[in-house]
């Protein structure tokens, strides 16, 4: 059970006593680490009778090059500033540098939240 509330410990190390039990709106979900591979999407129920689409695996990126957008295939993750191990494991996050059929591109979307990979070409 993921909890998005405060820490049960104070800054001094003392215990903070809870005012109430965990509520459903305070809960979070496990992250989806989007990997390079054949496209697989997952829908997750979210608040307000809506659904989120999460990309579990994907091999396609929408790359913006000036005024036009190109669909390119993702070959692998070159660099990932959020975590160096993500580049080794081919995990795509926002800010990751991808090797694509059109050249190197930097991811501008959050594939674990939006379900698709948007990127811009890197010179």
Swiss-Prot record:
Disordered: annotated span: 1-38
GO MF, one annotated term: structural constituent of ribosome
Tree of life domain: Archaea
GO biological process per UniProt: translation
Tagged with keyword Zinc: no
Cellular component, GO annotation: ribonucleoprotein complex; ribosome
InterPro entries for the chain: Ribosomal_eS8, Ribosomal_eS8_CS, Ribosomal_protein_eS8_arc, Ribosomal_Se8/biogenesis_NSA2
Gene3D superfamilies: 2.40.10.310
PROSITE patterns: RIBOSOMAL_S8E (PS01193)
Basic residues: bias regions: 7-26
Keywords of this entry: Ribonucleoprotein, Ribosomal protein
Family stated for the protein in its record: Belongs to the eukaryotic ribosomal protein eS8 family.
Quaternary structure note: Part of the 30S ribosomal subunit.
NCBIfam families named in the record: eS8
Name of this chain's protein: Small ribosomal subunit protein eS8
Source organism per UniProt: Haloarcula marismortui (strain ATCC 43049 / DSM 3752 / JCM 8966 / VKM B-1809) (Halobacterium marismortui)
């Amino acid at each position: 059970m993921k909890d998005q509330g405060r820490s049960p410990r104070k800054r001094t190390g003392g215990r903070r006593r809870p005012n109430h039990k965990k509520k459903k709106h305070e809960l979070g979900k496990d992250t989806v680490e989007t990997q390079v591979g054949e496209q697989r999407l997952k829908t997750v129920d979210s608040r307000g009778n809506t659904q989120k689409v999460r990309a579990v695996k994907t091999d396609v990126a929408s790359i913006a090059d000036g005024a036009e957008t190109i669909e390119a295939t993702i070959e692998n993750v070159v660099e990932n500033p959020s975590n160096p191990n993500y580049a080794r494991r081919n995990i795509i996050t926002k800010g990751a540098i991808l090797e694509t059929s059109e050249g190197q591109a930097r991811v501008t979307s959050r594939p674990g939240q939006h379900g698709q990979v948007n990127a811009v070409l890197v010179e």
